[in-house]
Amino acid sequence: MATTPAEFTQQSLTYTRMIDLSTGIEHQAVHEPWPPSIRRLRHDVEGLEWMERAFGIERSQLTQSGGLGPAFEEVTAITHCGTHVDAPWHYGPTSEGRPARTIEECPLEWFFSDGVVLDLRHKAPGERIEVADLGAALAAIDHVLRPLEIVLLMTGRDRFLGTPEYFEQPGMTRESTLWLCDHGVKVIGIDAYGFDRKFADMAEEARQTGDASRIWEAHFAGLEREYCQIEKLVNLDLLPRPTGFQVSCFPIKVEGASGGWSRVVAFV
């Protein structure tokens, strides 16, 4: 059963281990269509030069650091690379008829709660994850959703990370997304590149039918219901049970942003 933030106690946070459910920000990662760039500023070059400029000293005077300066990294990346949280602003300028929240405006209470894993590994690439699939997955674990629970969709696609097959994913529909939201769920995560079906399938369907309403249908459900989604999770198969654990998925505060990177961790 999900608890409200006020009900969390030291006892309720008792856990035996933590499981990292995140991918990292990797330099020129092959699984990122817009790959990050990481410029590393070294102890003995750029860091040292900065020390000399900032403090007006020479290397020989840095006896306490062995003549070295600090290391820095200069990262160029979109907010939707690596494991990240999409804010309602990502889906459009409004949500539920109100101005959509950017990532730093989303309530902290959404991002730490009881977790539920739904096993959807039987869904083939390109298939839709329907309401019936979610209902069957919940019935299989004898669980009734509670408000603020963080629902994690296990497709198994993370095992293909770094290969072309990673982008061959099933995806949520408008109806299945709204169904979870109508149960009080505010955060839904998936261990795939994206939340919707693979791009090629959506594009081909629109080309053949002339109907583009199914493109990014799960994303655009956020225009009707306010929710966040986590993309590019990993290691959901390492969770020892489908319920009875807690998830932390606080996003980085990026001013006015449509998303933010997150180190998603399960406490089991």
Where are the model-predicted features located?
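Active-/binding-site microenvironments in catalytic and ligand-binding cores
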Residues: 1-268
